[in-house]
Design a protein with these regions (language model features):
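Charged, amphipathic alpha-helical segments and their flanking helix caps
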Residues: 1-47, 71-177
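Short N-terminal edge-element motif at the start of the domain
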Residues: 44-58
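Short secondary-structure boundary/capping segments within folded domains
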Residues: 57-60, 80-81
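A short, hydrophobic beta-strand-centered structural micro-motif
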Residues: 59-74
Length: 177
C-alpha cells in the first residue's frame, strides 16, 4: 500500500518550540494526488473565509471544481493545567453545474461527498503521525452542504477540522521590555 506523501510541518520558532500542522499543504497535496479529484478536474485554491474567494473567482472561467482551504481559522487557547491551542481549519469544496439543473447539482454533491470520504481515509493516517508530535485532530469532523444560493451554478460544501497543539505559556523575561 502506498500512502500519500507527507507534507512538511511548519518549522518551530525560537520562542515557541511547538510543532504546527500545515493544513493548506496537506490538502493541496491530497488534491493533486487523489484520482477522483484529478478525474473530476478539482483545482486547489487558498481563500480567506466565506468573504475571501478571490482566487476561486479568478479561476471559475477556466476550471469547474475546487478544493479551497481557508487561510484563517477560529480557535482558542486553554490556559488551564496543560496549556494548548485549538484551531479549526475550514476546507471548501465547489463544483460548477448548469444553473437550475438539480440533477447535475446532486451528481456534484455526490462527488464531493465521496471526495470528502477519500480525504478522511488519509486524514486517519495523518492523525496518527500528528499525535507523535502532540498534535491532536478532533475525530468529529463536520461536513456541511451549502444551499444552492451561495455561489450560483455551483454545488458547495465545506468541512471543518479541529486541531489542538501544546502551547508553551511559560513566562519569558526576554519577551518583555
Amino acid at each position: 500500500m502506498i500512502f500519500p506523501k507527507r507534507p512538511p510541518m511548519i518549522e518551530e520558532t525560537p520562542n515557541n518550540p511547538s510543532f504546527s500542522w500545515n493544513a493548506t499543504a496537506f490538502f493541496e497535496d491530497l488534491t493533486k494526488r487523489n484520482k477522483l479529484a484529478q478525474k473530476k478536474g478539482f483545482t486547489f485554491c487558498r481563500v480567506s473565509g466565506l468573504d475571501g474567494f478571490e482566487e476561486l473567482l479568478g479561476k471559475m472561467m477556466t476550471k469547474t471544481a475546487f478544493v479551497c482551504v481557508s487561510d484563517i481559522s477560529q480557535g482558542f487557547t486553554d490556559i488551564n493545567n496543560t496549556p494548548h491551542t485549538r484551531r479549526v481549519k475550514t476546507v471548501f469544496l465547489a463544483m460548477r453545474h448548469a444553473i437550475d439543473d438539480m440533477k447535475a447539482r446532486e451528481r456534484c454533491m455526490n462527488t464531493m461527498r465521496e471526495l470528502f470520504r477519500q480525504f478522511m481515509s488519509v486524514l486517519i493516517m495523518e492523525q496518527t503521525r500528528l499525535q507523535e508530535h502532540s498534535i491532536y485532530v478532533d475525530p468529529r469532523i463536520s461536513f456541511q452542504e451549502i444551499d444552492r444560493y451561495f455561489l450560483s451554478g455551483c454545488a458547495c460544501a465545506y468541512f471543518q477540522i479541529g486541531v489542538e497543539t501544546y502551547t508553551d505559556l511559560q513566562y519569558n523575561t526576554d519577551e518583555w521590555l
